[in-house]
């Protein structure tokens, strides 16, 4: 039996009575953002809108992006990454559960020294994939060229954000590489592993 999104009380400053808001809206007011699903255009636009709004509201107070995602679409994910780099406040990234594929890319995109993984979190990197089987031959070639450009772009970002040599990142992206939190720290995707 689904219970929906839980509601919590929230009192606006200067108001006597609290109103009930869903838990995510309450957490957004504290600058805590959540990516708890596959990356697609809808969640990308929501997170971008929240980051821009909160940045305008207060450009000195940090944002916190909690990630538990199996990955998803590259272009919407890169849009989130670019926004993280663009907004004035530092964006902390926190991996809880899984940050795979585009999720790990966003995890690495947090402010350097402010990227964290919970102790039992898992991180996975790999190269971008496509649905070639649905394309005609001409489209297949164009899509392959675009995919190679995307792979090169993602690889360059991983190199910049992790400090690893290009050949190491390129080799790791050839296949699915799963890491524990401490392995992700050694790889430069996160800076800290949370402890009690």
UniProtKB/Swiss-Prot annotation:
Its main location: plastid. It holds the Pfam family CLP_protease. The active site is at 101 (nucleophile), 126. Disulfide bonds: none annotated. Its EC number is 3.4.21.92. Keywords: Chloroplast, Hydrolase, Plastid, Protease, Serine protease. SUPFAM superfamilies: ClpP/crotonase (SSF52096). One of its GO terms (molecular function) is ATP-dependent peptidase activity. One of its GO terms (cellular component) is endopeptidase Clp complex. It catalyses: Hydrolysis of proteins to small peptides in the presence of ATP and magnesium. alpha-casein is the usual test substrate. In the absence of ATP, only oligopeptides shorter than five residues are hydrolyzed (such as succinyl-Leu-Tyr-|-NHMec, and Leu-Tyr-Leu-|-Tyr-Trp, in which cleavage of the -Tyr-|-Leu- and -Tyr-|-Trp bonds also occurs). Gene3D superfamilies: 2-enoyl-CoA Hydratase, Chain A, domain 1. GO terms for biological process: protein quality control for misfolded or incompletely synthesized proteins. InterPro entries: ClpP, ClpP/crotonase-like_dom_sf, ClpP/TepA, ClpP_His_AS, ClpP_Ser_AS. Coiled coil: none annotated. It is found in: Plastid, Chloroplast stroma. Component of the chloroplastic Clp protease core complex. Cleaves peptides in various proteins in a process that requires ATP hydrolysis. Has a chymotrypsin-like activity. Plays a major role in the degradation of misfolded proteins. Belongs to the peptidase S14 family. This is ATP-dependent Clp protease proteolytic subunit. It comes from Gossypium hirsutum. The gene is clpP.
